[in-house]
């Protein structure tokens, strides 16, 4: 179970467009309202055989199939969609509740705004998505479903926070969230390419997205590259039980990651 292979699957599951791979994260005038507000909320995201042939054991198999479907609906099997949905929220909460955002703002000279909160959240959510795809990237598999649920949980939180900050202008808030969504999709592709390549490629991806091309301190970029590599290694080492069944993600502290 390697994150690098999972990343390739993740990248394959995304719609790669020419625009996305060349996206330079240009800020539009529309995002200057909500995204630059002080972040009061984050200072403390086959073929079916229809013949009627009767074969030995058919009735028993049918009964077993019905029982399995019933158990799946009520959540008594270990890998139900309902269980994975709960897991996705627990994993997202491990980011929103346990990451020290203030440390990121301070150490990387980020303004205390909603946009900075999203950039930090986005980076850690991407790490979770990469690890999720190691559990199966095909349609219907646990990893792909879990990935989608984590993204849903993140956008649910983003919408809640954005509405509180932009309650006076809901229409503009929606437009700004759409802009973030476009940037998020492009960031996933850039980060995937970076993690599968050497540190220079990853550093470029982080400089363009996380630092928004506004960082001349190479030590800061090198430190963030090291931090991302260490977090990816930590997640890759987690067995399925500690990631999906009973999520126990112990994020490494930024303060302990020095160049």
Swiss-Prot record:
Keywords for the protein's UniProt record, in alphabetical order: Membrane, Mitochondrion, Mitochondrion inner membrane
Record carries keyword Membrane: yes
A cellular component term, taken from the record's GO annotations: mitochondrial inner membrane
One biological process term in Gene Ontology: mitochondrial respiratory chain complex III assembly
InterPro entries: Ubiq_cyt_c_chap, Ubiqinol_cyt_c_chaperone_CPB3
Pfam families named among the record's database cross-references: Ubiq_cyt_C_chap
Subcellular location: Mitochondrion inner membrane
Record-stated family: Belongs to the CBP3 family.
Subunit structure: Interacts with sloth1; the interaction is probably involved in the assembly and stability of the mitochondrial ubiquinol-cytochrome c reductase complex.
Role description: Required for the assembly of the ubiquinol-cytochrome c reductase complex (mitochondrial respiratory chain complex III or cytochrome b-c1 complex). May be involved in cytochrome b translation and/or stability.
Name of the featured protein: Ubiquinol-cytochrome c reductase complex assembly factor 1
Species whose genome carries this gene: Drosophila melanogaster
Primary gene name: Uqcc1
